[in-house]
């Protein structure tokens, strides 16, 4: 199965995920209601790290939880033992095999903290050391670059949020996500055309900046990673707020800026940034569900409309995945054979 096959499989993978691990989600919610936690700590690497960023925003905004990202090296390299007994500790890993992520969860379990694995392998070492397991049920992911395990990880986090604080309208929006993912896949022809125009000439599109904010900061990070690992593009991701604190000095006409700017709390700032980029003669690729915002870029990618902000990263990443794949092909590279990478990365 190719990378493109797995990108196209995401609506069906989402349907499977929405039906998976129902008992585990109920058990987690019961545990946290009977023994409330003060915070959440998430351990992850690579693409899963970007799912963790989504968890920071979603569980913070929707559930009122303080969410921090673990630094696995504190445990694995330095032998540290951060006090997390009053936290829910989550390990996110498609393979569940990275020793440093397993180590963080093991250390938390020794302190008596509730632990949760979000993984595509329910028999993995990560699952074995966790109190609860949400299986992604994405099916085998053969491509080196993670796609369907990323979107199903986001769905798993959204389902966790909903289990902790149920809401009928939110549940209905979540149930619609497979269909919205299918709608998002329909952007491929326009995305391919943009990728060919940007990256078709030898030596073109070897650098770019990717900017998102709020929930879409996770999308910016994941979009940039896909461009790096597949297309060998020096793609630098930023929060739009951080971008203005210095890195904006990097912008110049020959460095495209990819901006995720859908409707929502961060929209006004993204629109202001797009106006500033235009004044500086910088070409932008704008991904948005608002036509007026898309018109501010030289190129535009339509995101499905009507998706709640807290769920939108699940669909906004899909055209970004397609874009990275087509940029890779336009640069004469094979997206199914990324350089120096293997499917399972085990860091200590």
Q: What are these model-derived regions, one by one?
A:
Residues 1-38, 132-136, 140-256, 266, ...:
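Active-site phosphate/pyrophosphate-binding segments
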Residues 223, 270-274, 316, 339:
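Composition- and surface-driven signal marking solvent-exposed, interaction-prone regions
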Residues 307-348:
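Generic C-terminus detector
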Residues 33-179, 183, 213, 256, ...:
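Glycine-rich phosphate-binding loops that contact phosphosugars or nucleotide phosphates
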